[in-house]
Amino acid sequence: DYDLVVIGSGPGGYVSAIKAAQKGKKTAVIEEKDIGGACLNVGCIPSKSYLTHAQWILSAEQANQYGLQVNKETLDFAKMVQRKDQVIQTLQGGIKQLFQKNKVDYIEGLASFDQEQQLFVNGEKISYTNLLLACGSHPFIPPINEVDKADYLTTDTFFNLEELPKELTVIGGGIVAVELAFAMKPLGVKVNLIEVASDILLTEDSVARQTIKKKLQQMKIDVTVQAKIEKVKKDAVVLSNGTKKYFDQLLIATGRQANLEVPQQLDLELDEVGHFVKVDQHYQTSKKGIYAIGDMIGGFQLAHAASAEGLRVVEAFCGGETYPVDQNMIPRCLYTDPEVASFGLGEDEAKENHDVTIKSFPFSGNGKALASAETEGFVKIISEQKYQQILGAVVVGSHATEMIHTILAVKESEGTVDELADIIFAHPTLSEAIGEEANSIIDQAIHG
């Protein structure tokens, strides 16, 4: 008998399993596909690998403006694919080693349940006391006319490409769609983005969004918003105004939906619209001893959110005091150029219930940014006026996804803008912009 069986080996599942084993629980992980889940195999990791290649090319082009003659004679995509695969294999091996080290049983196969909630994998019954569902999600394909006639890619299949397309059309304007546009264009691919909503990146700060849109324009990435798609042909997406966006590869990146096969077998209660598994504050489902986390329960569909939720689950069934993950404390990252990172309340949300101070400090006023030719972007902190509580923050710029954690750490420890302003930042660093921003909020700025 297992104390805990985890279904799914993504960032939510494998982290939870290891933590449970470390707490003395006999634990097993069941995985139908590849260890590491979507994040490791078809998401966060392979996309960052390609974005790194794109960044190297952009850096070489930038160097040419400042006296270094770097020629991009040829581009070996096969080597890029090889490197991406090596990174994935290294991380997969790392998870397997962690399972061995912590005595977590890893079972490959499809989990299924009978009417008595008995668990079977590969025809073998597996007994459990607690069950954690970390089954993840799959690409959502919208009902587009004749889309089934096109040989389209999803984010689950995009990284299987062995040759670069000449022209890539992406239906979708969210984080994944935009990141992949940034990854492909520097590699010589013509990229078209098609978004049916009023704008791309609608979940991002409005100023950050405009910064990224400006960069897309500079890169000559074709962006269509408020698009009305009439149909999809073999080699083109046809819009209602007659415009055709041609492609030799079509990617549909319109979000993901929860994998609900296992919850349905277990007859678990879903949310009001039937899209996600309903859970309580300890991530327990409608049935005792069965928990669910990550993409299956809604909220931010992010790897680190799933991991944090999984750790809360383990703490709960081990008898510890726990509390749900605060959605306002989850960092959100966009790996474009410049990067965008944020957490907490946005400007409009903050204004609804607080008297707020909103200021921003541009990287164009930062010495390291100027020396590094990385002056795009800014640091913005949204704070409450009376006690200077940090309500949210946005960083747009080089290394923004690393820098956001400085502000988040102060917020997590219940620090205020004053305490953030008191930090001695090394000079010259991009992080000094955080200190300048904090000091400007309390009217103590030197350079702002």
Protein language model features and the residues they cover:
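FAD-site-proximal beta/loop scaffold in flavoenzymes
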Residues: 148-164, 245-317
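Glycine-rich dinucleotide-binding loop and its adjacent helix/turn
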Residues: 44, 135-189, 194, 266-267, ...
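N-terminal Rossmann-like dinucleotide/flavin-binding domain of flavoprotein oxidoreductases
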Residues: 41-42, 46-125, 202-227, 234-235, ...
